[in-house]
Amino acid sequence: DMSLWDSIDDKGTMPSSLVMVGKKEHRFAILGENITISENCYVELLNNQNLIIRHNNNTKQKAHQVVNSLVGRLMASSSPGKLNVAMIDAEEMDGTCDVFKFLNRNIFQILARPEDIRKYLDEKERHIGNIIQNLLLGSVKSLYDYNQAKENKEPYHVIVIEDFPIGFNSESISLLQ
């Protein structure tokens, strides 16, 4: 009987909401012997509202791979129409999200210009405000409950921000908060 962690280590299948984000090494010296223990680091997507992946120039490519893996897994595990993704990338020429460029704009958007970023965040803030008002006026406690009660279900929105604060002006930073 194979556990979840065994299947991950064997590079087999794993839940779409669990994504490996890197490896961590621990080095010890015990009785004159140098020992290195390496462990994989995972993030559970379903239990996080915000995830920050910091990188430097040496790790930028790996960080982009992690972001693409996270977005790809979220999209693959969602039914059509239940997830919208926006990639805010003022330096879009770095090819971070090329793999997703073929998707319909209603599913995946790439925003690079400061005015487009501000407009998108303004629209999302107003839209979220309307949903919250509906939640407060109704007997539902969460977006999940809201979607269960509605015929036209509200999709989940994921906003990926690359190279923050590049491309953001003071108004878009305020909207993001």
Report each predicted region and the residues it spans.
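P-loop NTPase catalytic phosphate-binding loop
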Residues: 19-177
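Coiled-coil termination/hinge junctions
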Residues: 1-24
